[in-house]
């Protein structure tokens, strides 16, 4: 196993080591990702449960509002809507959770919601029954009043000489007072559903029925009318009892809903507490798993680092010893290499390098003698070459000086033409920039003109709408005047009614006061609308003048744009001619510089040739000296 690992490549060794670390790191990341996903899911579930609790709170508030509103249809619809929202959230949670404990709680919660809905429907039926009972009481009271009115008219129509006429009328008035007291007691019972109020209302009804029996004895001729009155009072009593039963049903439903609501809250809190406990358990598991995976990754990483380091550093140390021996001149060693990885290939290369160096040193010894004899011959030839190169250098310097002066003159012309071209280009750019600015100004002014036109139309529309508001205010003013008259008439009628109409008179005075304040506010609004219409007209006139000035500005900007276009065209022509002049001068300058460079190159070559000849002569002497030194150095190697 160790031999196999030693023979695989360093890339593969490092790849295996880092690969194991990366795999464990990936597993660690996967573990963290999975744990994080579980926590996120748990948080989402807790959020859903929080939404369920919010829906429950909304439902309980809606139920209280429904009870405060005494069974109002709008409040009932709102309560049903909140109950449906709560039920839908519960059904959604039932499809989301898979744990048996959660599913059981959600199932129990669903059953409680169904029972809660039944109780709510019973309460609605109770409120519907109370409304029906009140309608029945009102209709029965109206029939009883009508019977008493007809009976009173018949009694009052009798001759004044009738001795029993006054006594019969007093009995009828007493029965009417009894009926009025019954209605007052029933209203008190409706306002406060207490047993005492209920018994008081029923006792008063029984008293009214007893007076009816007395009337039957006193007025046997009016038995039909009295029977109608008695039937109406009996129906009124039945309606009161229906109201009592409906109130009892409402009270029972309220108690049931209170218990069911508390049960829903308890189960919802239990469901939320379960999620908290599961979250804590999953957090602990995630931390433990992360710690184990981290320790395992660190352990494997350390082991891989130690093993790979030993497989790489030991052969490197052996190779370093061999290289140091070669550096010290000892070429007698022979390395034995068995590894087949990159380090083995390196050791084999160093072994071949030692063999090659031995052969090289042996060859150098033989070549040093030949170099010494060749150096003497080279020195003689170099002296002749140096004399000819010095003569050529003098002639080339004279030609180079003349060409340099001509090139300087041509470059001056080219610079002047180029400066003129740059100036024309700058003028052309400025003219084009001015043209663009004018174009943008024209566009801005045209858009301003369009905005002014739209603003004028908007002001006209505002003026029309303010006129419509004026007509609406006339209607409101007329309605306020009519309300004032109606309130005045109601106050007069209430005054005629005396003590019984005092409360109605107070209400009529309040309505009249409201109508007068409405009329006064309407007049103030009319004044504001008139001021608004006047200001709107002034703004519209001013915007018409601004629109005319804007159109004139657009025309002037267009003329300025045309002038800038002409200037731009002229500057472009000047720029084109300057560019042609500059191009011609640059071509002449380039030709002159090319000739000058060629002559300078010739001169440089001559100088280099002369210098090379001198150096060659010196090198020949030096070469002979180096040959001796080389023989001395080669003798240091042991082969």
UniProtKB/Swiss-Prot annotation:
It is found in: Cell membrane. Residues 310-362 form the HAMP domain. Disruption phenotype: Mutant fails to respond to succinate but responds to toluene. Succinate binds at residues 60-65, 254. GO terms for molecular function: transmembrane signaling receptor activity. Keywords: Cell membrane, Chemotaxis, Coiled coil, Membrane, Methylation, Transducer, Transmembrane, Transmembrane helix. Binding of citrate to the ligand-binding domain reduces the chemotaxis towards the strong attractants such as malate and succinate. However, in physiologically relevant niches, citrate is mostly complexed with magnesium or calcium ions, and does not bind McpS. Its main location: membrane. Pfam families: HAMP, HBM, MCPsignal. Residues 1-13, 310-639 are cytoplasmic. Changing residue 254 to A: Abolishes binding of malate, fumarate, oxaloacetate, succinate and isocitrate. Decreases binding of citrate. Does not affect binding of butyrate. The keyword Membrane applies. Residues 35-288 are periplasmic. The chain crosses the membrane at residues 14-34, 289-309. Residues 191-245 form a coiled coil. Residues 367-603 form the Methyl-accepting transducer domain. SMART domains: HAMP, HBM, MA. Belongs to the methyl-accepting chemotaxis (MCP) protein family. This is Methyl-accepting chemotaxis protein McpS.
